C-alpha cells in the first residue's frame, strides 16, 4: 500500500469509518473532556487506552472548538491505584459529569459518554470522506 493510500485510510478512520463518536457536542454548554488513566493496561485501564486511541480522534475531528485533555500517569506498581476517569467539563472549568472508565470496554465508555453528554448525531451528509469512495467501505 502506498504512503498516500495509508494516509487516506488513516484519515477515513478518523472521519468516516469510526461511527460511534461521530457526534456534535454543543460547545456553548461544554468546554471539553479530560481523560485520566495510566500508561499501562494493568488495573483495568485497557478500555480507557483503547477509547483514547480509537474514539478520541473522531470526537476531536468533529468538535474542534472543544478542548481535550489527556493525562497519562506512569505507574509501574500494580498494587498502586491510579484514577481511570473521563470528566466532562463546563466553561467554568468545573466537572459536569464523571465517568469511571476502570474495567470497562471502550465501546461501553463511549456509550456512557453518549448517555451523559448532550449531543446530536452527525448527519450522514456531513460525514467527511477522502479518496475514492469504494476504498472507504
UniProtKB/Swiss-Prot annotation:
Signal peptide: none annotated. It is found in: Mitochondrion. GO terms for biological process: mitochondrial translation. Pfam families: L51_S25_CI-B8. Belongs to the mitochondrion-specific ribosomal protein mL61 family. Component of the mitochondrial ribosome (mitoribosome), a dedicated translation machinery responsible for the synthesis of mitochondrial genome-encoded proteins, including at least some of the essential transmembrane subunits of the mitochondrial respiratory chain. The mitoribosomes are attached to the mitochondrial inner membrane and translation products are cotranslationally integrated into the membrane. mL61 is not essential in cells grown at 30 degrees Celsius but is required for mitochondrial translation in cells grown at 18 degrees Celsius. Component of the mitochondrial large ribosomal subunit (mt-LSU). Mature yeast 74S mitochondrial ribosomes consist of a small (37S) and a large (54S) subunit. The 37S small subunit contains a 15S ribosomal RNA (15S mt-rRNA) and 34 different proteins. The 54S large subunit contains a 21S rRNA (21S mt-rRNA) and 46 different proteins. This is Large ribosomal subunit protein mL61. The lineage of its organism: Eukaryota, Fungi, Dikarya, Ascomycota, Saccharomycotina. The gene is MRP49.
Amino acid at each position: 500500500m502506498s504512503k498516500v493510500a495509508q494516509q487516506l485510510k488513516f484519515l477515513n478512520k478518523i472521519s468516516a469509518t469510526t461511527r460511534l463518536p461521530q457526534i456534535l457536542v454543543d460547545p456553548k454548554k461544554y468546554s471539553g473532556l479530560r481523560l485520566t488513566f495510566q500508561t499501562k493496561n494493568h488495573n483495568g485501564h485497557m478500555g480507557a487506552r483503547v477509547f483514547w486511541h480509537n474514539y478520541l480522534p473522531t470526537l476531536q475531528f468533529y468538535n474542534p472548538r472543544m478542548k481535550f485533555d489527556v493525562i497519562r500517569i506512569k505507574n509501574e506498581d500494580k498494587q498502586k491505584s491510579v484514577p481511570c476517569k473521563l470528566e466532562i467539563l463546563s466553561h467554568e472549568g468545573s466537572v459536569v459529569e464523571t465517568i469511571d472508565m476502570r474495567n470497562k470496554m471502550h465501546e461501553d465508555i463511549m456509550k456512557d459518554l453518549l448517555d451523559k453528554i448532550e449531543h446530536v448525531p452527525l448527519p450522514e451528509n456531513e460525514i467527511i470522506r477522502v479518496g475514492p469512495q469504494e476504498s472507504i467501505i
